[in-house]
């Protein structure tokens, strides 16, 4: 499915996680903040490039971006709306909530490298089950910037022990979409008490012989919004991404 076709389906009301959609095309996290907070967030992202790799930034009020020819208000499957850091609703369309002062940031997403993992024979459990990737707040703090601060959020994929090195090698070639894992193995080292109870997304089975592998996650900006409490923000619903018009290969390094 092309990015344009996927966006049209979401605009028409399809609400599903986008992992596995539009293979070969880059997916992105969305965070839209008032212009007054835009510099603080841009600096936050610059200081935390592993979790917040910025792919594109709009002018205030713009509803499309150079890598996203659709409408940022309607063409993602689901959005989260925050007021003073509190999640107030999850909706499929934010047209009525959009403001002329909103600056939108498209942040790299690890869904982008999943096609490369599958091609190399590395299983991706949430794609196998048709679910959402599990995501967790961690005990690692991001570097603060201005009024923005918050914890690192990670996504987790179980990987057979014999293929962990392959997964690291493949994903390290995609630094603009989180790159190599930030942690391999014991969840408790990240402050994760129950691997079966993710903070975002859905749990997946870790089978015998598999190791949990954790990548920095673009839900980190929303965790920063919850902690920093700007007056208003809009983000994608975790796992329900912006499918861009950029190719995965554009973010692949040798």
From Swiss-Prot:
This is Putative hydro-lyase SACE_1553. HAMAP family: Hydro_lyase (MF_01830). It comes from Saccharopolyspora erythraea (strain ATCC 11635 / DSM 40517 / JCM 4748 / NBRC 13426 / NCIMB 8594 / NRRL 2338). Belongs to the D-glutamate cyclase family. Its EC number is 4.2.1.-. The keyword Zinc-finger does not apply. InterPro entries: D-Glu_cyclase (IPR009906), Putative_hydro-lyase (IPR038021), UPF0317 (IPR016938). Pfam families: D-Glu_cyclase. One of its GO terms (molecular function) is lyase activity. Keywords: Lyase.
């Amino acid at each position: 499915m092309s990015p344009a076709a996927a966006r049209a389906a979401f605009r028409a009301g399809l609400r599903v996680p986008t992992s596995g959609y539009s293979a070969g095309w880059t997916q992105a996290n969305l965070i839209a903040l008032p212009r007054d907070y835009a510099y603080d967030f841009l600096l936050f992202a610059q200081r935390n490039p592993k979790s917040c790799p910025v792919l594109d930034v709009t002018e205030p009020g713009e509803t499309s971006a150079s890598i996203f020819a659709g409408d940022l208000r309607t063409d993602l499957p689901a959005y989260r709306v925050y007021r003073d850091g509190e999640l107030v609703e999850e909706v499929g369309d934010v047209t009525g909530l959009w403001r002329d002062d909103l600056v939108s940031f498209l942040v790299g997403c690890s869904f982008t490298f999943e096609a490369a993992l599958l091609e190399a024979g590395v299983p991706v459990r949430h794609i196998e089950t048709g679910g959402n990737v599990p995501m967790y707040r961690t005990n690692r703090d991001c570097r603060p910037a201005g009024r923005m601060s918050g914890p690192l959020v990670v996504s987790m994929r179980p990987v057979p022990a014999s293929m962990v090195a392959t997964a690291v090698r493949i994903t390290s070639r995609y630094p603009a979409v989180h790159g190599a894992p930030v942690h391999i193995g014991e969840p408790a080292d990240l402050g994760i008490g129950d691997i079966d109870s993710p903070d975002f997304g859905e749990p997946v089975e870790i089978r015998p012989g598999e190791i949990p592998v954790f990548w920095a996650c673009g839900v980190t900006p929303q965790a920063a919004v919850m902690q920093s409490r700007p007056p208003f923000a809009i983000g994608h619903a975790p796992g329900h991404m912006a499918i861009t018009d950029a190719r995965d290969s554009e973010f692949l390094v040798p």
